Design a protein with these regions (language model features):
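Catalytic cores of the polymerase beta-like nucleotidyltransferase superfamily
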Residues: 2-487
Length: 487
């Protein structure tokens, strides 16, 4: 019997417009016996409805009133058990996405790889997913060796597509809650909160993993990582965020399979980077990415620079900058991907700058060229949108201008729209010894002075000998037309 006394659908799985027969289901990537679940009654767990978003409760109750199964699922259940306020509330149901849209006027269907319903309540979005089943690794027409083959798939292609590396490109095969469990990544994320009696359904000992603060993949780890290499990044993210340890079988394949990240679409990796580095645990995420050999597949230029002694300080600067970013997030202060990618790519920019620093061009022009080269290469791994890439380059281009402290033009930097981010970057450089601490102190003090005193100070100051040199580089000597060099 299925849930709520309905006949079970084992072996009969909704597959878009058709059904899989019992014989066809033999090819499904499911265990021979689907799991039975443990029911943890309300009296034996700590989750209260008062801790659940009222909008999530509205979605759960309306689905149930319409005759559908509805569960709060995933990270929200895990976090509530840990006493953490969830950032998002996700719902799992046997209602199809189109059914959900009919129930909620404020619903939008999104996604192609995974078809989802987003129910909007002002700024809050409750994500509703239909129970999914595993399926045979059949390739849909349009698949190719191209790691970005997802873009070539047509809307009327089959509901599931897998590339030659085993990566799932699209997956819209619906099933039962018992099958849905096996589509989730970690046991700790596979707990279902039942709105009917406020119990928790546990199919894979997820509650025990939460108590032990342990991350364990559901199924064979290598197969699961090949299905979706981003699961390796999720393992790092949850370990960093929650302080969980990776179960040995879950941990072992990561370094060996890290190259699979090279086949993940660059736009998706951008989103994953924001989750890793802009959620309050970026410094620990970075350390774990390095430990498991993942960072070099996200930021290969930076990883190569960090391995060289002249740029080791850039790694220290990144770790310090991530720690400061974490502190700002935990204090509810704003952060921006612009600053994040500046510190992530600074070592690579310095290396590129120094490799080009033999010609007659001014340092500032070389810095611009180095930024462009590094950004162009990085886009093949992580698609940084122009709205962040352009201001990131401006932030780095402003660094030499901090050396100009004499003359009235020095004050113009204070009015630049990127001044604040560039100033914070200067402070970070000074903190790790890349910039002169006295320079950072001067720019800190000048901001506190009235305009008249600012003008008097810059007019009275003699020209600095290091004016206009690029950040982290020695000042080059320019040659006279006759061949003699001058400073």
């Amino acid at each position: 019997m299925g849930c709520y006394g309905r006949p079970g659908r084992r072996g009969l799985v909704v597959y878009g417009p058709k059904f899989l027969t019992q014989a066809e289901s033999l090819f499904l990537n499911l265990p021979s016996t689907l799991p039975t679940h443990i029911v943890i009654p309300r009296s034996e767990h700590s989750i209260s409805r008062s801790a659940i978003s009222p909008n999530a409760l509205k979605v759960l109750y309306r689905l149930r009133e319409a005759g559908y199964e509805a569960f709060l699922v995933g990270g929200a259940v895990r976090d509530l058990l840990l006493g953490i306020t969830p950032k998002d509330f996700d719902v799992a149901t046997n209602a199809l996405p189109e059914d959900v849209r009919r129930l909620f006027r404020n619903c939008r269907l999104i996604g192609r790889r995974f078809r989802l319903a987003h129910v909007h309540f002002g700024s809050e979005i409750i994500e509703v997913a239909t129970f999914r089943a595993a399926a045979a690794p059949e390739r849909a027409e349009g698949d190719s060796e191209d790691p970005d083959a997802e873009a070539s798939l047509t809307e009327d292609a089959e509901d599931r597509a897998i590339d030659t590396r085993g990566r799932i490109l699209r997956d819209n095969i619906y099933g039962t809650i018992e099958e849905d469990v096996w589509r989730r990544d970690f046991a700790a994320n596979a707990l279902y909160y039942n709105i009917d009696d406020f119990s928790i359904w546990d199919f894979v000992d997820g509650a025990a993993d939460v108590r032990a603060r342990r991350l364990k993949l559901i199924g064979e780890p290598e197969d699961r990582y090949r299905e979706d290499p981003v699961r390796m990044l999720r393992a790092v993210r949850f370990a960093a965020k929650l302080g969980f340890t990776l179960e040995p079988a879950t941990e072992e394949p990561i370094r060996r399979l890290a190259p699979l990240l090279d086949g993940v679409p660059a736009a998706r990796l951008f989103d994953e980077c924001l989750k890793l580095f802009l959620a309050g645990f970026g410094a620990q995420s970075f350390r774990l990415l390095e430990r498991y050999g993942l960072f070099e597949h996200l930021f290969p230029q930076s990883a190569a620079a960090f391995a060289l002694a002249p740029y080791a300080y850039a790694r220290d600067m990144l770790e310090t900058g991530l720690a400061h970013t974490d502190a700002r997030i935990q204090a509810d202060k704003p952060v921006t991907p612009t600053f994040l990618f500046a510190i992530l790519l600074f070592g690579a920019v310095l290396r590129e700058l120094n490799e080009q620093n033999a010609g007659p061009s001014p340092d500032v022009a070389l810095l611009m060229q180095a930024c462009d080269v590094v950004l162009k290469r990085q886009q093949s791994r992580i698609a940084i949108p122009r709205r962040f890439a352009v201001p990131m380059r401006e932030l780095l281009m402003l660094q030499p201008r901090f050396n100009r402290r004499s003359g009235i033009k020095a004050l113009g930097l204070l009015q630049h729209p990127r001044f604040r981010a560039a100033y914070d970057f200067l402070l970070l450089r000074a903190e790790v010894g890349i910039a002169d601490p006295e320079l950072a102190t001067w720019w800190t003090e000048i901001q506190t002075l009235p305009q008249e005193e600012r003008i008097a100070r810059v007019q009275a100051r003699p020209q600095d000998p290091a004016e206009a040199s690029a950040p982290g580089t020695r000042r080059r000597r320019r040659r006279r037309r006759g061949g003699a060099a001058r400073s």
